[in-house]
A protein has these predicted regions:
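Preference for extracellular/luminal or secreted protein segments
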Residues: 1-54
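Enzymes and membrane/adaptor proteins characterized by extended Gly/Ser/Thr/Asp/Glu-rich
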Residues: 41-119
Length: 119
């Protein structure tokens, strides 16, 4: 058994109780759904409702969109999820991997090309 009071979880008694009760009350379908992190190709409320309520996803990998749209999707999904979701995005080049208006920074090869290991 994993000690969720220890690092990296560091849960208090109330947090441990929530985890145990939540797991106990989940259906098999909900537990399987927690393993799924689909790619979010759409901000359409119908699509979001479908992946959240029909598949019980454990998270979502966002594709690039405007930051306001991404924030709205994120808020909607978190508000309608029984369990907090993992959020994933392609961030290896900065915030522009989730939001088209996010900050971009050099990729690994660009940084290496500077010849400056402090970059």
């Amino acid at each position: 058994m994993i000690d969720i009071k220890a690092a990296p979880f560091n849960l208090d008694d109330e947090g441990v109780k929530w985890v145990e009760e939540t797991k106990q009350n989940m259906t098999l379908e909900e537990k399987i759904g927690q393993l799924m992190i689909p790619i979010g190709y759409s901000a359409d409320p119908g699509y979001l409702q479908h992946v959240m309520l029909d598949h019980h996803i454990g998270g979502i990998l966002y594709r690039c969109g405007e930051s306001e749209e991404m924030q709205a999707c994120h808020r909607w999904l978190q508000e309608h999820s029984k369990i907090p979701l993992f959020i994933a995005a392609n961030l290896e080049a900065g915030g522009d991997g989730i939001a088209t208006d996010g900050t971009s920074f050099g990729k690994q090869m660009e940084i290496a090309a500077t010849g400056d290991p402090e970059q």
